[in-house]
Swiss-Prot record:
Residues 500-736 form the ABC transporter domain. InterPro entries: AAA+_ATPase, ABC1_TM_dom, ABC1_TM_sf, ABC_transporter-like_ATP-bd, ABC_transporter-like_CS, ABCB9_6-TMD, P-loop_NTPase, Type_1_exporter. This is ABC-type oligopeptide transporter ABCB9. Highly expressed in testis, particularly in the Sertoli cells of the seminiferous tubules, and at moderate levels in brain and spinal cord. Coiled coil: none annotated. It is an enzyme of class 7 (translocase). Disulfide bonds: none annotated. One of its GO terms (molecular function) is ATP binding. It catalyses: a [oligopeptide](in) + ATP + H2O = a [oligopeptide](out) + ADP + phosphate + H(+). The gene is Abcb9. Residues 184-467 form the ABC transmembrane type-1 domain.
């Protein structure tokens, strides 16, 4: 809200509050002046203290208004930081007004003074308005002058994005239960039945005691006991059905959340997985979704049950004694405020705990997935120490949670104890003065204990809900995330020649925005031809593959497939006509048949066998115990490196792709297997456009076109003989290889490319 509007509204209310309160006070004390009332103040008969409370809250609002008006940038911040002050003031005045009503009832039975009732009601109206106006002033937008550098309220930093409100997150979470509305209605019905049955139990228990102590009637006692038994049985059955339905509903919610989260994750752009650790994503998908469904289901169940019980208990309590009911409710606002403070703190701690657990999970996942490497360096103890340090960070946060919970239980328990002692003392006074019977006092005390248990449960529910909401915010952060690179192409022609053109391609990884990996790169891949990319490490060879696979967006230029931008093609179609075999292919924990036919809806077994034969994999597959039904293990761990490459080659060839990319695809093969695969590729060139990234001279020299990259630029193009004749970088690389001075067609460059994500492809 603008500053002048907030100031006008606040000043208008302060004037109204002081005027109305003063008028009511004056009409209620026509028989004496203000000075006389001050000199002879009687707390049992005067409302001077309520008038003074009005002046105090008006001064607070005026001070807040002046502070915001003088500095519209810093003032609202200070008000937001001091919300606890106005909360305590309103809470104290509200409790004092209740106590004032009880004191008046001691000398005026009943209270018939309309001016007292008018001031009593107006006090609560003005307290609510004061609290709201404080919040209104805290949301004032600063003027332009207040934001100028050098101003008192100018801090120079941008405000952090506001966190999504807990209520909105909870509402969004519950919206995922819409398909289960019928189940929720049934569960709510049985919840109400069970809660009402539990609410009537103390009443009929008191009736049973009265029939023995007062009426001394066995018939009335038997009737009361039968009713108690029926209520207990009925409420127990209803509670069991309610719990079962809620458990079913939130189990379905858990499945729904995980499915939505997983679908959102697999739709993200490739850069997203470069920036986020696998352990963090797995933690969101497993522990966070489980925590959300478990905590929210359990706590919503408890909250609804206790809400219904509280409603019934409050009705019975007011019917027994309105005075003791006011005494009871004096303490509960304090408990609610403590619960609110604790809940916010616990929510923040919960998010920190989940993040710390995710970091620990990432460490464990990284170590276990690379156990052979860890063992080869005898680094087991060091990895265990790293994991222990991560767990110790979690433990430190757990200690904070324990301390916060201890303080919360201590504060709420002490408040409940004060309320119970006050009820006993004041209730005894009412019984002695004849305003209440002893039986009603006993019944009221029973209901007060029930109410206390309900409020304690609601308090624990709040902290549990905040913990669940904290996890839900992390889950929704990924569910709601829109990928920055959308695969919305629609082209899917029946015939594709397979011509690929790189036109002035400039590319930068999002994780390294200031380093251009490719700079104005241009070359073409022709149908029926083999093109080889060579160059030093970090020259951009694998980046060209990533771009051709449409993994990343370009910063400049374009890549064309048959004259059309690759982004214009349908996502599934594009990766059916372009197949990739990487240096370290990833197999899935499935059978060899399923791995070869991965990503294809239906593939005849004969085509699987034919592709395996072309990839020189059929022989070793048939030697396995289960043949093509053999499970490859996690990431193909049951197969050797060469066997995995041949299965990955078969996975690419079974698609009969117009464009075939081999990124060091034969590096783990023996010479004979490599020769057979090369023969299969060169023998079927009329159906493939082949791009090879290789370091072996035997693989490169047979290519129809060799493209030499250096530092992200194309420095040479031609056949093997042409490039040797030209001299230059390619000739140096060949010479070094032939002399054995360096690894084949490669040397260490000044920079390295980030790990390629192409291992997720065939």
């Amino acid at each position: 809200m603008r500053l002048w509007k907030a100031v006008v509204v606040t000043l208008a209310f302060v004037s109204t509050d002081v005027g109305v309160t003063t008028a009511i006070y004056a009409f209620s004390h026509l028989d004496r002046s203000l000075l006389e009332d001050i000199r002879h103040f009687n707390i049992f008969d005067s409302v001077l203290d309520l008038w003074a409370a009005c002046l105090y809250r008006s001064c607070l609002l005026l001070g807040a208004t002046i502070g915001v008006a003088k500095n519209s940038a810093l003032g609202p911040r200070r008000l937001r930081a001091s919300w606890l002050v106005i909360t305590l003031v309103c809470l104290f005045v509200g409790i004092y007004a209740m106590a004032k009503l009880l004191l008046f009832s001691e000398v005026r039975r009943p209270i018939r003074d309309p001016w007292f009732w008018a001031l009593f009601v107006w006090t609560y109206i003005s307290l609510a308005a004061s609290f709201l106006l404080w919040g209104l002033l805290a949301t004032v937008r600063p003027d332009a002058e207040a934001l100028e550098p050098g101003n008192e309220g100018f801090h120079g930093e941008g405000g952090a994005p506001a966190e999504q409100a807990s209520g909105a997150t909870l509402q969004k979470l519950l919206s995922y239960t819409k398909p289960d509305v019928a189940f929720l209605v049934a569960a709510s019905f049985f919840l109400i039945v069970a809660a009402l049955g539990e609410t009537f139990l103390p009443y009929y228990t008191g009736r049973a005691i009265d029939s023995i102590v007062i009426q001394k009637s066995m018939d009335q006692f038997t009737t009361a006991v039968v009713v108690v038994c029926l209520l207990a049985i009925g409420s127990s059955l209803a509670a069991g059905i309610r719990g079962g339905i809620f458990t079913l509903v939130f189990a379905r919610l858990n499945i729904r959340l995980r499915n939505c989260l997983f679908r959102s994750l697999v739709s993200q752009e490739t850069s997203f997985f470069d920036e986020n650790r696998t352990g963090d994503l797995i933690s969101r998908l497993t522990s966070d979704t489980t925590m959300v469904s478990d905590l929210v289901s359990q706590n919503i169940n408890i909250f609804l049950r206790n809400t219904v019980k509280v409603t019934g208990v409050v009705v019975f309590m007011f019917s027994l004694s309105w005075q003791l009911s006011l005494v009871t409710f004096m303490g509960f606002p304090i408990i609610m405020m403590v619960s609110n403070i604790y809940g916010k703190y616990y929510k923040r701690l919960s998010k920190e705990v989940q993040s710390a657990l995710a970091r620990a999970s990432t460490t464990a996942e990284e170590t276990i997935s690379a156990m052979k490497t860890v063992r080869s360096f005898a680094n087991e103890e060091e990895e265990a120490e790293v994991f222990l340090r991560k767990l110790q960070q979690v433990y430190k946060l757990n200690r904070k949670e324990a301390a916060a919970y201890m303080s919360y239980v201590w504060g709420s328990g002490l408040t409940l104890l004060v309320v119970q002692v006050s009820i006993l003392y004041y209730g005894g006074h009412l019984v002695i003065s004849g305003q209440m019977s002893s039986g009603n006092l006993i019944a009221f005390i029973i209901y007060e204990f029930v109410l206390g248990d309900c409020m304690e449960s609601v308090g624990s529910v709040y902290s549990g809900l905040m913990q669940g909401v904290g996890a839900a915010e992390k889950v929704f952060e990924f569910i709601d995330r829109q990928p920055t690179m959308v695969h919305d192409g629609s082209l899917a022609p029946d015939h594709l020649e397979g011509r690929v053109d790189f036109e002035n391609v400039t590319f930068t990884y999002r994780t390294r925005p200031h380093t251009q990996v490719l700079q104005n790169v241009s070359f073409s891949l022709s149908p029926g031809k083999v093109t080889a990319l060579v160059g030093p490490s970090g020259s951009g060879k694998s980046s060209c593959v990533n771009i051709l696979e449409n993994f990343y967006p370009l910063q400049g230029g374009r890549v064309l497939l048959d004259g059309k931008p690759i982004g214009a093609y349908d996502h599934k179609y594009l990766h059916r006509v372009i197949s990739l075999v990487s240096q370290e292919p990833v197999l899935f924990a499935r059978s060899i048949t399923d791995n070869i036919s991965y990503g294809l809806p239906t593939v005849p077994f004969e085509m699987v066998v034919e592709a395996a034969q072309k990839a020189n994999a059929h022989g070793f597959i048939m030697e396995l115990q289960d043949g093509y039904s053999t499970e490859t293990g996690e990431k193909g761990a049951q197969l050797s490196g060469g066997q995995k490459q041949r299965v990955a080659m078969a996975r690419a060839l079974v698609r009969n792709p117009p464009v075939l990319i081999l990124d060091e695809a034969t590096s783990a093969l023996d010479a004979e297997s490599e020769y057979l695969i090369q023969q299969a590729i060169h023998g079927n060139l009329q159906r493939h456009t082949v791009l090879i990234i290789a370091h072996r001279l035997s693989t490169v020299e047979r290519a129809h076109l060799i493209v030499v990259l250096d530092k992200g630029r194309v420095v040479q193009q031609g056949t093997h003989q042409q490039l040797l004749a030209q001299g230059g970088l390619y000739a140096k690389l060949v010479q070094r290889q032939m002399l054995g001075l360096e690894h084949p067609l490669d040397y260490t460059a000044s920079h390295k490319e980030p790990p390629s994500n192409t291992e997720h492809k065939a």
